């Protein structure tokens, strides 16, 4: 295999969610920024990106990178074949690598079959073996996104014009049976037109699921298809929606209908398979990972769970963290993180922090709690609940704060709180812990004393009693905070140590580790 000299290498950095411009995108963008000094780097995106705007939001220099926009439904494996190295930094992406070399960035590992019991996994394996012989020769030709997992079904969302190619003996007519999942986030029914070889033949309505049973049982549609040379073309035409417009989750794909499977099989076995949604569940294993040369997590915590869940070796590349400037400290406790309810992910626990601060405020009335973070329309009820809990307390909200405002808060804050993972069963759901803790490092770099949850990536940042403290519950949070507030000398010593500790995670350290890793992969 021929690899070009370093200044000729082509590198692709793929992130489906560039427009979100969150922590994951900052991580991916930092990789692109550094590698662009030595290589030709493209950002692979699914919609146009204004590089100037993106680099401003991420706080990076992306002037040397190029943006390559590809269709949502174009397989990344195919797109990446033109590159020497693919770095796939998309959250929960199952795309195989097509480049000469590949690095998979795992923000946190997941199991495609994590919701299945052992008996369901065994049944699933049996069904897949039977299905290969029973559902007939049908392929997803174009207009379908890579596989997604909905509950325990694997589906292929169309983009509004999904094309199936059906291999049937010419002039022979058979019934094509299509299983369509009924999950639509807005619970709106969908009208679908069907064309066969360019001719309108029928239409049907996918009735959105109203309960759990309907969610698990796909809707079966039958379409008569007459064989043609090279295969018959079946088009599924529907209106589309964008998930981000409904749930604010950053998913800006245009989605039509979710197809579980399609086949031309007949007889009792095929009928049985149609009633079992497990047929659409993903197979066990992680075949897409085999196409990558390295698996990389942003913390030792993530790497540990890659080993436990995937049984794969994983390297650690901690994020590059912007170093802030400290100033004159005020009686401020700061916490930075997006506002969203626990049921929507690893919540930053602002509601619990306000509850703890209410008890603290009576003893230390001069101290303030400042909460910084964004909030989508969908998460507004949670923010409203936090505001109600904070009524009458010296709690200041900074929703959508500017970079300058955040810098000023870091500069003056004396203590930094981070409570992600509080009151969670992290053995059962480890993703609810903080995977690393970029904001903790940012606050430390400005001299704030971190008092953070004893879980996840925080354990790799803070040194107990040297830079700050850990807590396991609300009582521990209050006890450590009182200790730091009461002792000015202790607070000063911990703050000075925090500044030095934060330098371990600066950009130069990140760049050095990244270059070593890439050189090893390309060697």
Predicted regions and their residues:
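Membrane-proximal helix-turn-helix segments that form the acceptor-binding/catalytic region
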Residues: 121-134, 268-295
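Active-site donor-binding segments of glycosyltransferases and PAPS-dependent sulfotransferases
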Residues: 38-95, 175, 186, 191, ...
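Nucleotide-activated donor-binding/catalytic signature segment of Leloir-type glycosyltransferases, i.e.
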Residues: 59-62, 373, 383-407
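Short acidic/histidine- and often glycine-rich active-site loop of Leloir-type glycosyltransferases
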Residues: 427, 451-465, 469-470
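Short hydrophobic beta-strand element within catalytic cores of glycosyltransferases
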Residues: 440-452
